[in-house]
Each structure stands twice: as structure tokens, then as C-alpha cells.
Amino acid sequence: RACSCSPVHPQQAFCNADVVIRAKAVSEKEVDSGNDIYGNPIKRIQYEIKQIKMFKGPDKDIEFIYTAPSSAVCGVSLDVGGKKEYLIAGKAEGDGKMHITLCDFIVPWDTLSTTQKKSLNHRYQMGCECKITRCPMIPCYISSPDECLWMDWVTEKSINGHQAKFFACIKRSDGSCAWYRGAAPPKQEFLDIEDP
């Protein structure tokens, strides 16, 4: 059996998560986390992490991240060794702990666009009352004014497209929501995207 998740825009990932941090994994080990309904032990991977910055979450730094032992059950594998930095969004478990799955937004920090990094500070939060609706194929429509249509899949066949990288869906004063372009990307990057 495989893990299946529906794709989300980074803003949705931010809004849905209890905890959003920038961190690196220092070590990993398999731990027991209680038993399942049949009495079999449940194994989880425990990553000890070094939190660099918290964008959303509890007052206490996150020290440990837990995940399922294999990707088939949505487990996430992080590089340990403390070199690679990640943006990690997931569920709080209290007392400096969080749980992550493959359906959560977990990406190497250096793959984020400047706009995405900046949006983590407040812009995504400003749009949490808006709804981002993914358009899997044309035509697609919004059903209420507080929705933004996420078109990356149709226009670029990628969920990591232009709107994911450079836009946030923000509520305007009249209550409607609209895509708002963040920090202008560097010219070269912009030109590359314009290429047919």
C-alpha cells in the first residue's frame, strides 16, 4: 500500500500546520510509540533536530520530530548530519515534539523562492481565511469570492509552479480573496519562466 496525498499550495500547508519551522536533523533512531489495536508495538522514527527558526507554533522550541518508519505509510526521510536545512510543517505533539508525514510540506530550505521564504513571516498567515482551490483541468471555477484558483498544474504541469513559488492568496478589504504577487523575482528567473 502506498501513501497518497493531495497536493497543496505552500500557503495551505502553512495554514493547515500547527508548527512550521526551519531546522536541520542531527540524528535519527527507531523508537516504540505504544501499541496498535492488536497489541503490536508501533515503531516510529525519531529525529533529533536543531531548530533554526519557528514561523508558527508553540512557545517552546521543537527538539524532536517523529514520523512513520517507511514511505509506504507516509514516513518522511530527512538527511541527518546537521548539514541540510529544511522547511518543515507538521502537527504539534506538545513538549517540544512534532509529527510529520509525506503529506506535510517538507522541502529543503534552499529550494524555496525568496518570496516563499518572506511569505512565511506573515503573508501566508494573512491568507489563512482564504481558500485555495486546485484546478486539475480546464475549465474550473471558483464557487465563492474567498477562493483563489491554483492553476499551476494546468499551466505548467507542476505543483511547484509560478503561483506556488511567487504568490499568496490574500483577503482584500471587501472580503474577497485574490492572488498577490510577493517580492518581484530576479529578472533572469522571470525571463526563464517566460520562455516557451
Swiss-Prot record:
Asked whether the UniProt record includes Zinc among its keywords, one would answer yes
Principal place where this protein is found? Answer: secreted
- Organism equals Cricetulus longicaudatus
The record's Gene Ontology biological-process terms are: negative regulation of membrane protein ectodomain proteolysis; response to cytokine; response to hormone
Q: What protein name is recorded for this chain?
A: Metalloproteinase inhibitor 2
Alphabetical keyword list: Disulfide bond, Metal-binding, Metalloenzyme inhibitor, Metalloprotease inhibitor, Protease inhibitor, Secreted, Signal, Zinc
Xref: SUPFAM superfamilies: TIMP-like
Q: What family does the Swiss-Prot or TrEMBL record give for this protein?
A: Belongs to the protease inhibitor I35 (TIMP) family.
